[in-house]
């Protein structure tokens, strides 16, 4: 998935990549800050600040538009279908060369003033289903959005969001993630060594916690081994299969 904030100017500043299903917004960026529990970046030419925090099967964004105008959000699935909802978007994306679908449910704190399907560099306001959905927010300069993902269904993605994130406060979600990581990495305290050596050690320790991944969703899980949904029997199902989370385009 691609989540792309844009200031509407000429055709939403969207350039086609030669494929209708792959629209992009051209960004340059600076002041990037990455931690295990947060991400922020300034899209300098667009004058847009993006803040992000992940949860288990959900994530949250705060987008600040620095320029007055008709601000918009484009959600794109490279290989799937999206539907414009009252406050956002739902749908699925197929992982390349597999039968596996990643489902998405995304909602914003503000109701979009209008919405439509982006295709051929233009937005069809009459259509509400397609590979790329454009949501318009007018002169609103601050946009909050949150999403859930699932390997089971868009409805389950919504449940995952409602379970993991109940706020539109990015800092609150990031702070919760920071506490979890501090508790986890703080189980081992090292003495001596240089700061560089400590960074290497804790970076390596952090990476050991990136795998395995719990794919259970309210007692069920999708297995890519047979393409079926199973009951987990009360035992979380772990695998090295990655979730693919929507993120700002670079």
What is the predicted function of each stretch?
Residues 1-9, 14, 243-250:
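Single conserved hydrophobic/aromatic residue that forms the stacking wall/gate
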Residues 6, 10-239:
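Beta-sandwich/jelly-roll carbohydrate-recognition scaffolds of carbohydrate-active enzymes
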């Amino acid at each position: 998935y691609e989540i792309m904030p844009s200031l509407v100017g000429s055709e939403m500043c969207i350039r086609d990549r030669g494929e209708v299903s792959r629209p992009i917004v051209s960004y340059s960026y600076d002041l990037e800050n990455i931690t295990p529990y947060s991400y922020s970046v300034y899209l300098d030419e667009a004058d847009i600040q993006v803040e992000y925090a992940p949860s288990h099967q959900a994530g949250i964004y705060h987008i600040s538009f620095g320029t007055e105008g008709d601000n918009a959000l484009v959600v794109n699935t490279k290989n799937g279908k999206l539907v414009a909802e009252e406050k956002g978007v739902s749908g699925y994306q197929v992982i390349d060369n597999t039968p596996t679908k990643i489902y998405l449910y995304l909602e914003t704190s503000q109701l979009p003033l209008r919405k439509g399907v982006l295709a051929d560099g233009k937005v069809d306001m009459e259509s509400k289903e397609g590979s790329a959905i454009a949501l318009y927010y007018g002169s609103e300069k601050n946009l909050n959005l949150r999403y859930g993902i699932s390997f089971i269904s868009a409805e389950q993605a919504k449940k995952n969001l409602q379970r993991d994130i109940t706020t539109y406060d990015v800092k609150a979600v990031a702070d919760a993630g920071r506490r979890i990581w501090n508790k986890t990495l703080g189980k081992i305290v090292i003495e001596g060594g240089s700061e560089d050596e400590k960074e290497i050690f804790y970076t390596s320790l952090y990476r050991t916690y990136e795998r395995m991944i719990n794919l259970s969703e309210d007692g069920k899980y999708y297995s890519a081994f047979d393409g079926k949904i199973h009951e987990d029997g009360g035992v979380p199902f772990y695998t090295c299969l990655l979730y693919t989370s929507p993120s700002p385009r670079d």
